[in-house]
Amino acid sequence: MKIDDLSNALRHEGGLSRRLFLAYAASLSSIPLLSRYASAAPPHVFTSDPFSFGVASGDPDHESVILWTRLAPKPLEPGGGMPKAPVEVHWEIAEDNSFKKIVQSGKVNATPELGHSVHIEPRDLKPDHWYSYRFKSGDATSPVGRTRTLPAPDASPDKLRFAVTSCQNFEAGLFTAYQQMAADKPDFVFHLGDYIYEYASGRNGKIRTHQGPEIESLDQYRIRYAQYKGDKDLQAIHAA
């Protein structure tokens, strides 16, 4: 008895009689059930830190926020030094920096199709509230990031601190301004673009230079983003 036979019965026999149901049930009982762990990726052993880009969060509303990281132990290589297979990533979001008050946690597979990046969207969070979050994969743990939700739609907060940035060109200068931005402890940061530039190496490279030619392919874009996101000051403001 096949699954298709059951489907045909539902379509053409006007539903299942008790006799047919028992016959199909007996047949289907011989099909092995998949373990709930069947799709889980095996633990991965890293030889260097896979969280080379740190962590980031964004796009909040009053009850949710998006958490991000990417596994890339060799960030400036195609594929980021990762295997062409899914790798399991655990995540936690807590009300304290020591993670004694974890409010949500889970696990997800980081896949090669998405460059082994993960996007988590925990919901049912408190409005106008700070949280800490982190990721784990294999024996590696990411830096801790801070994030916050928006005030409730009908709220009138006394104050909110915003920071605004744009046009960060890796070749044109260092990102040390983000040190001061993080020290100012903004509630939210708006990046208006451009986040990266596609130019070939050396066009503005008086301070430091892009890697490779003008970017066109997906691998080239990922490597260019890796150059930018490898900057520790940029990582710090993303995590602040």
What residue ranges belong to the model's regions?
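N-terminal secretory signal peptides
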Residues: 1-16, 27
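Bacterial N-terminal signal peptides
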Residues: 26-32
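Boundary at the C-terminal end of the N-terminal hydrophobic targeting segment
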Residues: 38-40
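Divalent metal-dependent phosphoesterase catalytic cores across multiple superfamilies
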Residues: 10, 42-240
